[in-house]
């Protein structure tokens, strides 16, 4: 692998100043550097990756053992080595084939849980399960991290398919979040879902207790309108939640990969079991593609390799995710957790510090909003930010087709502008037509130059349906896997979240005035003194 890394770096240095636009002298450039799956098109031709770089990147994936580790993951091997666990979120969307963990086929239990979820959701949506004031009108999902970001993103994305109760999401321990969410709801017609595998997550359980007190003001048996997604049956029982409304999942399903199962309960309630199954089917389709397609035609592999080229080879530290699809507004935040919690590591699988950067900083906002905010830096800033556009050919509002046309034209224009830029000569010509001359023209022209030659990709799809969203989410999950394998890291633990939790527990009595700040650094002690109640 070392030789391939070196060859990639040498090639990048040789072509660093080449204009990406020049690559399009090849009339087949766009076709060659694009990949299709069903109605999805991934166009990565507006990057500086040429045939040589592509072939080296594919060789890198082969040398890293992506194919072998891929099969190990799907077969239930314990590839999460630091926690001694399998990584089988894929089984949640492929329940029709045996998957063995420690020699036991886990799919019968998955099918049973899925059937229980469907039965509960059908009862709730039909009015057979009611609140103490009538049919359930609102559902509040209380969770954090993977118990919140995925289902919240998906509920917004699939809003056109939401024909069930309204779904709300509470994650932050800041009391303002749950206060503002509950204040306009009726406790007697609200269901609260507490999503915590251990039923001990501080933020989640604090909010759950607050919700229970809120509900108790209006209903005689508040726990009767709670459901739980947890494996801690003793704790959910102590909370008062009947076992029929408790849905568990295994430790080989990581939080940020979990919305395919019980963590997706709120999503299933919102869109119904049939649409939820279509979401699962879309993910399963991407799984099959990932397992079967050769690397040169494999969407998750290619997304990963393009990302590695930009981050590890070119040194671009961030990637902007820019969905030109308002209902994907939460996708960048979801991908922040998926990618940065998975691949934001400093130690390789063997315990040694990495000799290269790990995953990139992922951020973004939906278009066209971002064009009037941070695109200035993307187009004319001194740092190059690779951009990842997502856009649908068709919207959900046929009476607003013209607005969708404007949206798509803006997406394509931004991608083209990043590629093409605007030269100083072109800027002079434009200003000259406006009547500027001499030194003022020259002064203004410099400010109107766009360097261009900034890489971007476009993921286009027919329409944002449940199946399409399933394909997109699974695509990014597998991208993370491929990048992690090539970087030699464990993408499925998250020890970086632990230290802050431990310190927060120690700080609570200090902030309450029950303990001193001995042993704390001067800054923390000062802040405790200022913020102490």
From Swiss-Prot:
GO cellular component: cytosol
Reaction catalyzed: alpha-D-glucose 6-phosphate = beta-D-fructose 6-phosphate
UniProt KW keywords: Cytoplasm, Gluconeogenesis, Glycolysis, Isomerase
Pathway this chain belongs to: Carbohydrate biosynthesis; gluconeogenesis; Carbohydrate degradation; glycolysis; D-glyceraldehyde 3-phosphate and glycerone phosphate from D-glucose: step 2/4
Tree of life domain: Bacteria
Active site, renumbered: 341 (proton donor), 372, 501
Alphabetical list of InterPro entries matching this protein: G6P_Isomerase (IPR001672), G6P_Isomerase_C (IPR023096), Phosphoglucose_isomerase_CS (IPR018189), SIS_dom_sf (IPR046348), SIS_PGI_1 (IPR035476), SIS_PGI_2 (IPR035482)
Its EC number(s): 5.3.1.9
CDD domains, alphabetized: SIS_PGI_1, SIS_PGI_2
Cellular location(s): Cytoplasm
MF GO annotations: carbohydrate derivative binding; glucose-6-phosphate isomerase activity; monosaccharide binding
Principal subcellular localization: cytoplasm
One BP annotation, GO: gluconeogenesis
PROSITE patterns: P_GLUCOSE_ISOMERASE_1, P_GLUCOSE_ISOMERASE_2, P_GLUCOSE_ISOMERASE_3
Family the entry assigns: Belongs to the GPI family.
Task performed by this protein: Catalyzes the reversible isomerization of glucose-6-phosphate to fructose-6-phosphate.
PANTHER family, A to Z: GLUCOSE-6-PHOSPHATE ISOMERASE (PTHR11469:SF1)
Protein name per UniProt: Glucose-6-phosphate isomerase
Organism: Cereibacter sphaeroides (strain ATCC 17023 / DSM 158 / JCM 6121 / CCUG 31486 / LMG 2827 / NBRC 12203 / NCIMB 8253 / ATH 2.4.1.) (Rhodobacter sphaeroides)
Gene this chain is encoded by: pgi
